[in-house]
């Protein structure tokens, strides 16, 4: 797990412009605009104004894109250490391995002294996967040194760590991932990824859904029940759409379902304001039918007829 200390505050402007040019982006007007964005004045709390000499604007519309340009060089360097290592590729070609048959190529590469590694990155958040702890420790040192020398970026030693995925979870983009045994194949232990919503994301989702469920029961101010239900349904779709790729999403959504059903049972079902009877609610759209049509958890508001999407019913 890598964490770059204050990444967006420490991007080197000169290096970034050279990277943009090296990528083939040579429109001088565009580069001028990017320079102006990078050097946009910042008003300080005391009222003074400073011109930044490094970093990209926090929340700036092109900051994520600039982050990818900066770290694109890291991606290629990591790839060159294993997947696209020129020495290994030459060795594979000499052995007559065709380019399409990468599995055989990797088998040969594993017999060399190369360090097997695979990177997954989103903006400045990235993970590097290795087979052994010793390899991971060496990779950690190498990447830390490379980032410092090539991009002038510093790794946070407190937040950067080596994790054994057989024993502990690693969090990435709101997910927590681990590997678990899946029997043996050709005499070797095989593993598959086990993934869930990370604890913080699950807790936040639970709090927001429960709060919105209470607002359906008792709308705030002049907001109507149908607006509150629509807001709740949007939240359900957002959570399910993002996290549905996790293997354990059904377990996580059942946890959320129990929390919101406590609110609905105490505040809505008890007051006879919800019904399971689909004839008393509005007709479901084609998309709603495909997604929730088979769910016994679906409820309808008796007053406005809107369906309340069941957070506990999620399909991969």
Briefly describe each language-model feature range.
Residues 228-282:
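Non-catalytic, peripheral interaction segments enriched in hydrophobic/basic residues
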Residues 1-157, 162-165, 169:
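Conserved polymerase palm-domain catalytic core
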């Amino acid at each position: 797990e890598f964490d770059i200390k204050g990444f967006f505050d420490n991007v080197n402007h000169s290096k970034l412009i050279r990277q943009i040019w090296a990528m083939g982006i040579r429109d001088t007007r565009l580069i001028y605009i990017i320079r102006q964005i990078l050097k946009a004045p910042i008003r300080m709390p005391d009222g003074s104004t400073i011109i930044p000499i490094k970093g990209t604007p926090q929340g700036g519309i092109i900051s994520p894109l600039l982050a990818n340009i900066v770290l694109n060089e890291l991606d290629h360097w990591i790839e060159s250490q294993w997947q696209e290592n020129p020495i290994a590729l030459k060795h594979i070609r000499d052995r007559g391995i065709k380019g399409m048959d990468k599995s055989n190529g990797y088998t040969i590469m594993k017999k060399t002294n190369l360090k097997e590694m695979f990177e997954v990155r989103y903006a400045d958040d990235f993970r590097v996967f290795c087979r052994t702890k010793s390899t991971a420790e060496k990779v950690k040192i190498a990447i830390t040194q490379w980032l410092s020398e090539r991009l002038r970026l510093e790794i946070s030693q407190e937040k950067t760590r080596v994790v054994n995925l057989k024993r502990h979870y690693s969090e990435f983009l709101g997910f927590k991932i681990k590997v678990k045994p899946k029997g043996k194949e050709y005499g070797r232990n095989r593993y598959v990824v086990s993934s869930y919503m990370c604890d913080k994301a699950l807790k936040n989702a639970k709090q927001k859904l429960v709060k919105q469920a209470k607002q359906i029961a008792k709308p705030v101010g002049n907001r109507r029940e149908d607006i509150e239900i629509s807001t709740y349904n949007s939240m359900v779709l957002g959570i399910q759409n993002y996290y549905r790729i996790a293997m354990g999403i059904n377990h996580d959504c059942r946890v959320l379902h129990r929390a919101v059903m406590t609110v609905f049972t105490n505040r809505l079902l008890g007051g006879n304001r919800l019904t399971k009877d689909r004839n008393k609610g509005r007709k479901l759209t084609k998309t709603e039918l495909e997604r929730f049509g088979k769910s016994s958890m679906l409820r309808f508001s008796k007053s406005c007829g809107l369906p309340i999407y069941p957070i506990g019913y999620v399909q991969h």
